[in-house]
Amino acid sequence: MSIASNLKKIRAEKGYSLEKVARLADLSLNTIVKIENGVNKNPTIDTLSKIAKALEVKVDDLIQK
């Protein structure tokens, strides 16, 4: 699985909107949308860390295949 599909799956499991993830991660909505849609396939570790913290998961959960 890609980062995009992992993010989408985890976000859906938590019942979080894209906007909620962006707000909790202190990132722009555009950044979250680009990652989840696969436009940005290589987000920085800082970005991944913020998203993981917002979703209450480990970075590994986002990047695992």
Q: Where in the sequence are the language-model features?
A:
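Residue cluster at the C-terminal edge of the helix-turn-helix DNA-binding motif
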Residues: L24, N42, K53-A54
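Recognition helix of helix-turn-helix/homeodomain-like DNA-binding domains
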Residues: L27-N42
